[in-house]
From Swiss-Prot:
Comp. bias intervals (Basic and acidic residues): 356-368
Tissue: Expressed at relatively high levels in both proximal and distal regions of the fin bud during pectoral fin development.
Organism: Danio rerio
Name of the molecule in the record: Tax1-binding protein 1 homolog B
Disulfide bond annotation, renumbered to this chain: none
Domain of life according to the entry: Eukaryota
A molecular-function term among this protein's GO annotations: zinc ion binding
Upper classification of the organism: Eukaryota, Metazoa, Chordata, Craniata, Vertebrata
Length: 823
């Protein structure tokens, strides 16, 4: 009750007036936990029923309409009139109601809107406790002295179950007895019918005895005929057995031949697998040889190009050394002349600005001489290195040629091996065709034997059926003879009782023993024939299996032939691919040669353009020197006409401002002599005379910071990382000397001037710490730095000298993966 008060207090927030719209009738205080629960309620006139209204069981203390335990839809009343009260009921099944948990529950009516419009008094679900009148004491059935207290209802239920079990057993026994009675009645009727049949048969037998007596003699004659036929059939059976033995021997012979064929096919398969493996190995070796040959050809091409480049560099350096030697001799002679002039000037005149200029020129000449000597030493060292590199390149080229020859020999051997394998494939093909023909003939022989076996089997079955028919006829005749003899014995017996004894006796006792022996003989013959027929069936099964195996071997041989054909086609395709690759290789070689020729033409064009520019430069220098000479002549004319005693004669004529200090022999210089106004390089230059091409006098030698001393062709190679493009030296000129035109505008093809400036910074190799003079030829400096690296001939990527040679070769080969390795 306290729980009910708490539930009502918890639901005080809702409208209490709504709970009276539905009134629950006859609500008990408790109900059985698993029993059907019927709920009666009355819908007052204050509520309008709806099909979605429902009645639920709520635990006391609920707060919302969702706290239900279970619910049922409220049935909609028929012929409902608004404003009237109506009684309805719902039944909760036992498996939906709560268990005996000691809680209080109540019915609630919930509308389709979720409003609770009625609630019942609380109740519980609990089992009924029995009273003293319903209890009963009884002894234990186990024979002990224990008294068991139970309810009368359970006791009566137990007794009822026992009685029903006994009733069921009695009914089953009754059914069994009724079935036995019906069976006995049926047996009685059957025996009566058999008795009537026996009576009729005995009468019929009496009638038949007379007929049997008449036919006994004819049966005896037929028996003799049957014996004769049996002997003939036995002889025929022996003949069939001999034929079957012969057929069996032929089958065994064919089995041995089939085993031999299987062994031969296995050997051929093994040979085929070995040849396939050998062919695969040859293909792999061939691919490796191709790759190696391609690599060697690439190396050969690269080394040939390097060798040509080194040869050209060697020639250039030799020419440069010869030029420098000539220039050195020329400079020495110029210095001697200058020294003579200087002594004469010192002897004839006082020190003035001209002597200072001459001293400055002398100092510059000395510096120029030192730089020239240093450059000559460096060129000698480079020439020595280039000759060593050329020797190494020649040795490497010879080695590569030897390896190429060995590779060609290996390729020829591989081709010979491929031809040998093709010949073996042809031989295997012909052998498989011969085996297929042999197998076809074997199949025909097996089919012929199978037909013979089928014929023999049919004849054997016909003979067995004939013997079975004759055996049945003999049995019938023997039974008739036995019955006839029994009837004769009955007639001879003195009484009917004595005659009944022989009739009831078995026919074997009256027979003389010949029927039983004949039955045994026939049984033995039939068993033997059945065994022989079973053996024949087994042999036929064996022949069928052999035929199936032969067909399988034929299929395998055809598959092997197809595989050999496919391998031959693949080999031909591989040979075609090799030919196409060879053609591609030849095309690539032609393309490389054309590229090299084109590069040579471009180099020749560049040399020609350089030669033209050098000529133009020399012309400009000659014009400049002429203007300088004119100015000096004007200055000399303005001086005192006082005669000066010269210690040495004047080497220059007064009317010719451009004579040579030293008789000069024209030399074939590749890049021109920077100290001479003309440089005859070939026979075509001989048409220009000294009058047409004036030479510069030695009074105005080019300073180290003014013009180009020596120009070398620059290689079009990428610079190493960390090296910056050096700034071109700014030529400075003295105020008292005339300004000479810059030749850089004529050298815009990647060449850098090599000149030594005393005030400039020296160049230092970042790898070997070798010091180079300032404004050393940038291309040579880059060449020296790049000599510390391995350069890829395809992409110009740089690698350290100590890097793995295999990695370097692998990188070079990656440029040829698309057309060499993927075939």
């Amino acid at each position: 009750m306290a729980l009910f008060l708490e539930g009502t207090a918890a639901s005080s927030a809702m409208e209490t007036s709504n709970f009276a719209h539905v009134i629950f009738q006859n609500v008990g205080k408790s109900y059985l936990p698993h029993g059907a629960l019927e709920c009666h309620y009355t819908l007052t006139q204050f509520i309008k029923p709806h099909p979605k209204d429902w009645v639920g069981i709520f635990k006391v203390g609920w707060s919302t309409a969702r706290d239900y335990y279970t619910f049922l839809w409220s049935p909609l009343p028929d012929n409902y009139t608004e404003g009237t009260a109506i009684n309805r009921s719902v039944v909760f099944q036992g498996y939906y109601v709560p268990n005996d948990d000691g809680e209080f529950y109540q019915f609630c009516y919930v509308t389709h809107k979720g409003e609770i419009r009625g609630a019942s008094t609380p109740f519980q679900f609990r089992a009924n406790s029995p009273t003293e009148e319903e209890l009963l004491t009884m002894e234990d059935e186990g024979g002990s002295d224990i008294l068991v207290v139970t309810t009368k209802a359970s006791y009566l239920e137990q007794k009822m179950e026992q009685i029903q079990q006994e009733k069921k057993e009695l009914l089953e026994n009754l059914d069994l007895l009724q079935k036995e009675r019906d069976e006995l009645i049926d047996e009685k009727n059957r025996l009566e019918k058999e008795y009537e049949q026996e009576r009729e048969s005995s009468a019929q037998l009496r009638k038949d005895v007379q007929e049997l007596q008449l036919s006994a003699q004819s049966l005896q004659e037929e028996r003799e005929e049957v014996k004769r036929r049996m002997e003939e059939s036995t002889a025929r059976l022996l003949q069939l057995e001999e034929d079957l033995i012969g057929v069996t021997q032929k089958g065994l012979q064919k089995e041995t031949e089939l085993d031999c064929l299987k062994d031969r096919v296995k050997k051929l398969n093994l040979e085929k697998e070995a040849l396939e493996g050998q062919l695969k190995n040859e293909k792999d070796e061939k691919e490796l040889y191709k790759i190696h040959l391609k690599n060697r050809e690439l190396e050969n091409t690269k080394l040939s190009a390097e060798l040509q480049m080194l040869k050209s560099v060697d020639v250039n350096k030799e020419n440069t050394i010869a030029q420098l030697k000539d220039e050195l001799a020329r400079v020495k002679s110029c210095l001697a002349e200058k020294e003579k002039q200087h002594r004469q000037l010192l002897a004839n005149s006082s020190p003035s600005g001209e002597s200072k200029a001459l001293r400055e020129q002398l100092r510059q000449k000395e510096e120029q001489l030192q730089a020239t000597q240093q450059q000559a030493n460096m060129l000698k060292a480079e020439l020595r290195d280039s000759s060593n590199a050329r020797d190494r390149s020649m040795a490497e080229l010879y080695r590569i040629r030897v390896e190429a020859e060995t590779l060609k020999k290996g390729q020829a051997d591989a081709r010979a091996e491929c031809s040998r394998l093709e010949q073996q494939l042809e031989e295997m093909k012909s052998s498989t065709q011969q085996e297929a023909q042999c197998k076809e003939s074997d199949v025909l022989a097996v089919a012929e034997l199978q037909r013979e076996v089928e014929d023999l089997r049919l004849r054997l079955q016909m003979a067995a059926e004939h013997y079975k028919d004759k055996y049945k006829e003999c049995q019938k005749l023997q039974k008739q003879v036995v019955k006839f003899n029994e009837q004769q014995g009955v007639k001879r017996s003195p009484g009917s009782d004595a005659a009944a004894g022989p009739l009831s006796a078995s026919p074997e006792a009256s027979a003389p023993g010949s029927p039983s022996t004949s039955d045994a003989v026939l049984d033995a013959i039939i068993h033997g024939r059945l065994k022989s027929s079973s053996k024949e069936l087994d042999k036929n099964d064996k022949y069928r299996k052999c035929k199936q195996m032969l067909n399988e071997e034929r299929e395998r041989c055809s598959m092997i032939t197809d595989e050999l054909t496919k391998m031959e086609v693949k080999l031909r395709e591989q040979m075609k691919t090799n030919e196409s690759l060879r053609m591609q290789l030849a095309a690539e070689e032609d393309r490389y040669k054309s590229q090299v020729a084109e590069k040579g033409r471009e180099l020749k064009e560049l040399k020609d353009s350089l030669f033209v520019l050098t000529k133009e430069k020399e012309k400009l220098e000659g014009q400049l020197q002429k203007s300088v000479n004119r100015e000096e002549e004007q200055k000399d004319s303005n001086l005192d006409v006082q005669s000066v005693f010269l210690q040495y004669p004047m080497p220059y004529a007064q009317d010719d401002p451009s004579p040579l200090l030293v008789p000069q022999r024209p030399t074939d210089l590749l890049f021109g002599n920077p100290y001479s106004s003309t440089d005859s390089r070939d026979g075509a230059d001989g048409e220009f005379s000294d009058d047409q091409m004036p030479r510069l006098p030695p009074v105005g030698p080019p300073s180290w910071d003014s013009n180009v001393v020596c120009i070398q062709p620059a290689r079009n190679l990428s610079r190493p990382d960390g090296l910056e493009e050096p700034e071109e030296p700014q030529s400075t000129q003295n105020d008292d000397e005339p300004a000479a035109p810059e030749p850089a505008e004529f050298l815009n093809d990647g060449q850098m001037p090599f000149c030594f400036e005393p005030t400039g910074e020296q160049k230092r190799c970042p790898l070997c710490e070798v010091i180079f003079p300032p404004h050393y030829d940038q291309s040579k400096f880059e060449e020296h730095v790049e000599s510390h690296w391995k350069i890829c001939p395809m992409c110009s990527e740089q690698f350290p000298l100590d890097c793995d040679q295999q990695l370097f070769e692998k990188h070079v080969l990656t440029h040829f993966d698309s057309n060499v390795l993927n075939f």
